[in-house]
Amino acid sequence: MSNDKAKHPMKVGIGGPVGSGKTALIEVLCKKMKTDYQLAVVTNDIYTKEDQQILINAHALESDRIIGVETGGCPHTAIREDVSMNLLAIEELIDKFNNLDIIFIESGGDNLSATFSPELSDWNLYVIDVAAGDKIPRKGGPGITKSDFLIINKIDLAQYVGASLDVMKFDTHTMRNNRPWTFTNLKTGYGIESVINFLREKKLINNKM
């Protein structure tokens, strides 16, 4: 990899409400992609570094490739209005590993209006879960309608919460206007290949820029 590309790894923002599966998604992506790509992660929590520790304990990556940021306030602010702490963490990772391909940036749990600053993220993934109800896609918001890739997680819970996957599929197609998305069950790996293929495609685009 050229020195120029080494200084500009692809940055992937991962947002979504609390408990939707953002950390679980990053864990699976890291485990499946780390043999082909040089990866690192920045996690955001308000008062702790819980998500960082979860990923370390799960051996998603080596511990020094995962940095936890304590935002100390609204998680939306740290990924949109004032991204300085996240940019410092990214800079630290790039200085430490000069051949990084992809950095995943996990936002703190937030609502459907949360979006990443273009300064912080090249591509945005957004995670919602079936347990929140089948009405979530039609509620809209930037995470649903504008994210580069939408993940509807925990499809195995649909039968237990009375959610219709057919309704969610119809509403998602309507709200996203042909933007890519997928159903997932991160416990079994169902749907994850669609996410990985999307990232591989975008990485090829970034390499040409």
Curated annotation (Swiss-Prot):
InterPro entries: CobW/HypB/UreG_nucleotide-bd (IPR003495), P-loop_NTPase (IPR027417), UreG (IPR004400). Signal peptide: none annotated. One of its GO terms (cellular component) is cytoplasm. It comes from the Bacteria. Transmembrane segments: none annotated. The keyword Signal does not apply. One of its GO terms (molecular function) is GTPase activity. It is found in: Cytoplasm. Keywords: Chaperone, Cytoplasm, GTP-binding, Nickel insertion, Nucleotide-binding. Pfam families: cobW. GO terms for biological process: urea catabolic process. GTP binds at G16, P17, V18, G19, S20, G21, K22, T23. Homodimer. UreD, UreF and UreG form a complex that acts as a GTP-hydrolysis-dependent molecular chaperone, activating the urease apoprotein by helping to assemble the nickel containing metallocenter of UreC. The UreE protein probably delivers the nickel. Facilitates the functional incorporation of the urease nickel metallocenter. This process requires GTP hydrolysis, probably effectuated by UreG. Belongs to the SIMIBI class G3E GTPase family. UreG subfamily. This is Urease accessory protein UreG. It comes from Blochmanniella floridana. The lineage of its organism: Bacteria, Pseudomonadati, Pseudomonadota, Gammaproteobacteria, Enterobacterales. The gene is ureG.
